[in-house]
Design a protein with these regions (language model features):
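Small beta-barrel nucleic-acid-binding modules, primarily SNase/OB-fold domains
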Residues: 2-182
Length: 182
């Protein structure tokens, strides 16, 4: 019995000293290949939040559409932009309708970044349609969102900034004359 204990202690010490010389296993590597989930969009809650077939709520990373529902954020946005709450909600409906037309009922691939959930327990993701359309980018490109960068989820931040600048200069979506969000 004492001999078995002695052998276990020796193995433990050998493992402890050899550990630094071996690379981590693939699943322990946070910078490994992206992880994906495939599902169907069953509901578009607002312009930047979807619900999947398994009832998972997905907040699209990197973009922020105008608020549709009454909230503290809606009040802050109204104060910041000097726009009436009803105007912001109207812009929010336009963004939601665009997102709904783009992906409602369609099969999607969800890609993750560093953090997988937000403080509201929504799944954070980049969403792609079967044809390869990058939903987050398409919403930004068509002018229905502003860039929202929340580190550490910054994988496509530069792309989103370029798309926002182009949509603004082309006066697309919410940047049309008289409706812009700023």
């Amino acid at each position: 019995m004492v001999r078995v204990k002695y052998i276990q202690i020796i193995i433990l010490f050998i493992g402890f000293f050899l550990y630094p010389f071996f690379p981590p296993l693939p699943f322990a590597n946070s910078e490994g290949p992206a992880q994906y989930i495939f599902s169907y969009v069953t509901r578009v809650i607002d312009g930047d939040t979807l619900e999947l077939a398994d009832r998972t709520r997905v907040r699209l990373i990197g973009i922020d559409t105008p608020e549709l529902h009454f909230s503290r954020k809606l009040l802050r946005d109204s104060e910041r932009s000097k726009k009436d709450i009803a105007v912001i909600q109207s812009l929010g409906r336009r963004a939601r309708d665009f997102t709904r037309k783009l992906c409602m009922g369609k099969k999607v691939r969800l890609e993750f970044d560093i953090e997988k959930t937000d403080r509201y327990n929504r799944t954070l993701g980049y969403v792609y349609l079967e044809d390869g359309t990058f939903v987050n980018a398409k919403i930004m490109e068509e002018g229905y969102a502003q860039v929202l960068t929340v580190p550490p989820n910054v994988k496509y931040a530069e792309l989103f900034l370029r798309l926002q600048d182009r949509a603004r200069s082309d006066k697309r979506g919410l940047w049309q004359r008289g409706t812009h969000m700023n």
